[in-house]
Amino acid sequence: MGKLRFLFALWMAKLSIPALKITHHDGTDFPGSLACRLCPDFLRYVGKPPTIVAITGTNGKTTVSNTIADILEANGRKVLSNRAGSNMWSGIATTLLAGCTLSGKLREGYDTAVLEVDERSSSRIYPYVQPDVLVVTNLYRDSIKRNAHTDFISFILN
């Protein structure tokens, strides 16, 4: 049942991408959001590259993740990356969705994922997408309502 549900979610999410383009929407997180709503274990089943680099922190995630992806690509790696900064579970799912076939397996050639991950969303992502390298840019209390205290964010990341 789980695999059928995953495939249905995958196909619906992949179909949503051209629909979003036709209606002039970016779709940086909607396909992944749809996939995860239809199959809550979507991140578990979707194909992932053998090497995963995750970048998290309060500030600088997009710059650091794009720089790492650029360096890896310049050195011949084929990289999946959420360059637009869609860094919550739905954006991560959209990024992985872009790199997989209609059967959910990783497309040939991809060897690395460089994923910007929202520090507050990490507890929903890392159980399914386990990074080989975790880069933490910094932890600040720049938004008290959201992050409360740096120790709280550190607790989430651990």
Language model regions located:
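Phosphate-binding loop of NTP-binding sites
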Residues: 3-158
